[in-house]
Every structure is written in structure tokens, then in C-alpha cells.
């Protein structure tokens, strides 16, 4: 179901109901019915649909009404569109998508860019190396930025690391100063993952192409099934977060850092990235899928490749499905 697309509103009844309930307080069936212009029995049907389509937990208490088990911070078109438009980005806001990256690629095929896709939930969210990205409704931030890139390899090198830097600085500005980077583009807090990034290309990477930067940030999620690694969320550290404020802060950081990257390349941001790398000068193992290399992390090169000191010899690694882990 699509809520907003190019300024048009869909599925208004359900979204109006969620907006009323997002404060986490009790609302009577009469109050909800009057707001929606339907009977109390119809309200219950709407609520059942909300539960079915979003998996949100609802409480029904006789004499008090209905409330969500946890408050929500729904994405708000009125708050987001003006700022995105000022940056020159078209905003596409959805309730549920298969994947924000997949939708961004579909929109690119119709000739649109630059653009930002946001969704309340993903049914087939994707991370690096084909992993699932768990994407419950209204809990986290799922977004994809699609840009046109000219200049070939120079403009692409290090871009995923720059996006990670923008995400990390966003989290620090939101009140999480301990956020740090793990090569190539994950963001960690206290040894646990809080954000991941997936870059996908379409077109000719040697000349003109489009880049889709998919970003997932754990925001207000308390628990989740299907995550196979230690994770944390903003909520755990600073309490409930307004996801509109987070989205706008992230958009601003992305524009700042990507504009600088377009001007100076990754080399102009390399020192800042290395200063934030949580495993800098630590002994780690890099896996390529078929081989493993153990050594001390020296940093990154001017293209964003990982520099490892292996048996007294410095080597650089980039591209492919590489994975870095800390040696115990």
C-alpha cells in the first residue's frame, strides 16, 4: 500500500487512524469513529486491518478504548517535503514496499533523479551480501537516495564510506556521540550494529551512471526476530526518536558529505573517516568468501579500500563481497 507518491494521498482512512493512535494513549471507539466518519463497528474492522497489515500490537480495554502497545513516530509528508524540495530531491514516501532500493531503481528507470525513497516498512529489505534487513512497520528508518554520477571511477570511489560517515555524524548530532564506523560502511555503537548501507549501481560505472544508496537505521525498535548479529537502536540510548527529525538530519548530512565527495573525492574525507573507525590499529580478519586474511588495520586508502598489515607487508582490499571481523 502506498501512502504518498508524488504528492498524492492514498489509503487515507487507515493512515488517519494510525495518526490518531500514534501517541500511544487510549482513544474511544466513538472518538475514532467520529474522526473517520464511520461507525464503531467499522472502527474495529479498520483496527483489525491495521494489525493485519502492520503487525502492530493493539490493546482493547472496555470502557477506555483502544491504544497501540507502543507510541509511534510516523513519517509526515508535510514536515519532509519542503526540506527535500529545497535540496532539489523528489520525495517518494510509502507505507510498505518490498525494498526502498528496489523502488528507487524502478523510479530511475522512468528517468527520475535525484530522489529519496522512504518507507514505513519493507517486506523484502536487503543488506550487504544478500542478507535480509529486518524492517518492522514504523520502528526504524528505511530510505534510499538515488543520484546521477558523472566522472566514472573517481566519483564512485569511497562513496559507500562517505555515506556511512554521513549516517554516523547524523547519529552523533541526534545525541549518540559514541557512534563509530566499521569498514566498509556499517555504523556501530558499543560493539553492536545500529545502521547498515547498501550501494547499487545502474548504468556505465566508467562514465555516467546512477547510484542508489540504501540506508537502514535502527531507531525505536525494542525487539526483533531474524537478526543474526548483535544490534542496538537509538531508542536504547536516548529514548523515543522523532523519525521525521532523523530523516531530515540525515538528508542534510548526506547532501553535505556527498557534495564534498563530488568536489574533492574520498581523499578529502579520508582522515575524518579513519578517526571514526572503531577497529583502527586493531587486529582483524578479512573474508573474501573464498579466502581469509588476518592482519592489523592501518586505515583506508584514497579510494576507500581497506589497508591491512599482513606479516609485515601492507595490502589493500576493495570491491566484492568483503567482510571484516575483529580477532578475539
Predicted regions located by residue number:
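N-terminal lobe of the biotin/lipoate ligase/transferase fold
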Residues: 4, 10, 15-172
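Short loop/edge segments at beta-strand edges and connector loops
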Residues: 95, 181-183
